[in-house]
Every structure is written in C-alpha cells, then in structure tokens.
C-alpha cells in the first residue's frame, strides 16, 4: 500500500468527528404539505445544509442509511424507509425527492437494500413484511407497469429510465447520472445496466423474502423473473470480447461501448458469473486514479465535463464497486480503492474543513460541475466514508 494512502489514527478520528457532528445539521422534519414540499411522517437526512435542505432524495438515502446504521441511528434510518413506504402508498411510486414537481420522476430503486440494512439490526419481521409489500408494489406499479404513459419496461423484459415528461433529458435525471455521456443524449433509447441490476436485486430479494416466509410459490415466481432478466442482460449487455457490461440501445438494437462504472453493478447485484467478474476486474485500471474511481473512462466524449463523467468520482459509485469486489472475493482490489478514496476525503477535509458531494479523483479537489456549484456536506459521502472506516477498520486491517 502506498504510504500516501495510509489513514493515521488521527485522520481516522478527524473523519469520524466531522461526520458525527454533521448529522444534526442535516436532520430534517417536514411533516406537513407546504409550498413545494409534500409532508413526510418521519424525520430524515437531507444531503446537506445548502441547496438540498429539506429534501429526502431516493437514491441518496440508500447510501445515507449505510452510515446511519453504523452510527447507531437506527430509528432515523428506519424512519427514512418508512417515508418511502408512505410515498409509495400515497403516490404509487417513490419520487426522486419529496417535492411536488418531482412526482413524475423516480430514481434507481434501492428500497429492498435499505430494508435489509434496517432489518439486520432490528429483526422486526412485522415491519419487514410491510416494507417488502411496498417494494413489490413499486416494482409492479412503476418499473414493470406496461400501462403507464411513461413506460419503463420496453424490450425483452428489461426496463429503461423514463419520467412523466418522456424526454431524454428528464430520463437522465431519473437515472441519477444527470448529466453524463453514457447515453449520448438519448437516455430513453437505452436499457441501462445499473437500473436492470437494481431490479434484478429486487426480484432476488423478494424471492428470498418469500422463501423465508414459507411461501414457495411467490418465491419461485420472483426467482424465475430474476433469471429471465439475468439471461436477457447477459445476451444484450455483456460483451464477451471486451469482458464488460454495457448499456444497450434497444432502438437501434446495438450494445454500447462507452465504459462507465455502471458496468460494475452486476457485481454488486451478484448477477455476474465468477468468470465474468474476473474479466471485469481487469478493467479497473480504466477508471482508477489517485483519489479513487472516475465515473467514466477518459474519452473524447466526456471532455464536456458533464458532472457524472471523467474526471469526477462520486461516492455512491465507489461504494458499489467496492461492495461488488468484496462479493466476488477481490478483497485486495476493494481495499486499495477504499484507501485511495478515504485518503482523498481526509486530505480534502484537512484542506477545506468539509467533505464534498463529488471529487475530481485525478487532482484530489472537489468535483467539476456544470449544473450547480459542487456541494459540501455531504450525506452520502459522510455515510460511505463511515462505512469504509468500519469495514476496513484497524481491527479488520486498515
């Protein structure tokens, strides 16, 4: 391990202190419908105390929950999941955040994974039954509903991003990768690797839940659905020659060739075979820099500095790749990337006094942005740093 990436005991404590102190600044309560926000029944964590104050974002919350359960804030984490159950029951979808004008847009679904994090601590089976029922509704009423105007399931049982406005730009917002060169400004035309991995994980999580509930018929139905998705994804998205998963342009019946960290989601979802994983790990060098992983490979397409392209590295994608590597036994690679990202955060905290939404992983500065000023704070960064410190703590080999 490069000495520049070693986290000292003081650095460890400085990061923990900052994160623990910041939770209170971003804990929000918004119980009533008011102005642009609709009310939520439980307190929640917003991304920061800046432009995202009072917003509970969907995909942000998964990574935030990872940190909350590791800082003994289980009731807050459970309340955030309960807020999503409330949204699903009220609106028949989980919007990207708790604002009226976002009711036609969701985000990559992570609710079953949030439920698993909370249940692992509480063991509350009654609560899990209620929560998993909401995820089943979300899957059938939004992501797999062929009767919606904004149809997501479009080709061979696979889904795309598509919000109420049915525009490429709005679909890219639903992806959470706003903006990126991944979709070549035609997001509606693509079956994304990450979205379909998330839906595959819903199906396998629901299959396991029903198996544990002694309901084999329901379990088998979701398992069949998951296996069908896995076969379709392998057929359309896996490039045997390149050894990587790519988004699929179903309008032109063409597999993409643009490398992004979305291609590692099959490791996180445990969809890839071990032979595929071995080939995928060889591509880490395309993305790896001193501060961790860039969201995309450095190519001419991404020289516009779209915020989800090279040279930016986003904390959620670091975690997805690290967890995926751990799932398949690539512990040394996971450790190396984790140390790079922790070291980057430690250095930026020392220099700026804050952690940030995203980073330029080449220079080690807060990330490039063309949409809004890069935000400090930051809930998912803090949570993922906390998770990494716990996972690779001194007792575990940090």
Each predicted region: which residue ranges?
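Extended glycan-interaction surfaces of carbohydrate-active proteins
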Residues: 2-55, 79-98, 148-191, 228-313, ...
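Extended, well-ordered alpha-helical scaffold segments
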Residues: 11-18, 73-84, 125-144, 202, ...
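Alpha-helical support elements that line or immediately flank enzyme active sites
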Residues: 56-87, 262-273, 318-331
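TPR repeat positional signature
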Residues: 61, 108, 112-115, 196, ...
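Aromatic/His-enriched, Gly/Pro-containing loop or helix-boundary segments
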Residues: 88-131
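Heptad-repeat amphipathic alpha-helical coiled-coil interaction surface used
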Residues: 112, 119, 200, 206-207, ...
């Amino acid at each position: 391990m490069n000495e520049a990436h070693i986290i000292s005991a003081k650095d460890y404590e400085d990061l923990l202190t900052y994160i623990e102190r910041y939770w209170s600044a971003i804990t929000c309560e918004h119980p009533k419908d008011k102005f642009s926000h609709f009310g939520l029944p439980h307190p929640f964590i917003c991304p920061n105390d800046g432009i995202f104050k009072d917003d509970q974002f969907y995909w942000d919350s998964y990574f935030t929950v990872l940190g909350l359960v590791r800082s003994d804030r289980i009731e807050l984490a459970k309340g955030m999941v309960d807020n999503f159950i409330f949204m699903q029951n009220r609106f028949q979808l989980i919007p990207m955040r708790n604002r009226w004008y976002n009711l036609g847009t969701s985000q990559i679904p992570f609710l079953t994974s949030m439920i698993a994090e909370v249940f692992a601590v509480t063991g509350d089976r009654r609560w899990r039954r209620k929560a998993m029922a909401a995820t089943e509704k979300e899957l059938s009423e939004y992501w797999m509903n062929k009767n919606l105007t904004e149809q997501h399931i479009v080709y061979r049982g696979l889904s795309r991003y598509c919000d109420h406005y049915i525009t490429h730009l709005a679909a890219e917002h639903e992806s959470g990768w706003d903006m990126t060169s991944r979709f070549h400004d035609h997001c509606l035309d693509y079956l994304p690797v990450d979205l379909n991995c998330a839906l595959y994980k819903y199906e396998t999580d629901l299959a396991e839940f029903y198996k544990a509930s002694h309901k084999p018929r329901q379990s088998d139905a979701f398992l069949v659905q998951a296996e069908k998705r896995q076969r379709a994804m392998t057929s359309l998205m896996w490039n045997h020659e390149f050894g990587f998963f790519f988004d699929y342009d179903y309008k032109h019946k063409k597999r993409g060739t643009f490398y992004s960290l979305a291609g590692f989601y099959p490791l996180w979802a445990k969809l890839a075979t071990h032979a595929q994983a071995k080939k995928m790990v060889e591509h880490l060098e395309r993305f790896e820099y001193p501060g961790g992983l860039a969201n995309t490979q450095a190519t001419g397409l991404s020289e516009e500095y779209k915020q989800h392209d090279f040279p930016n590295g986003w904390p959620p994608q670091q975690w997805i790749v690290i967890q995926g590597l751990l799932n398949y036994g690539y512990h040394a690679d996971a450790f190396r990337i984790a140390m790079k990202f922790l070291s980057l955060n430690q250095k930026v905290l020392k220099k700026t006094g804050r952690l940030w939404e995203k980073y330029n992983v080449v220079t080690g500065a807060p990330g490039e942005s063309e949409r809004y000023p890069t935000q400090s704070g930051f809930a998912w960064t803090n949570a993922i740093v906390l998770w990494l410190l716990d996972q690779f703590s001194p007792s575990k080999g940090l």
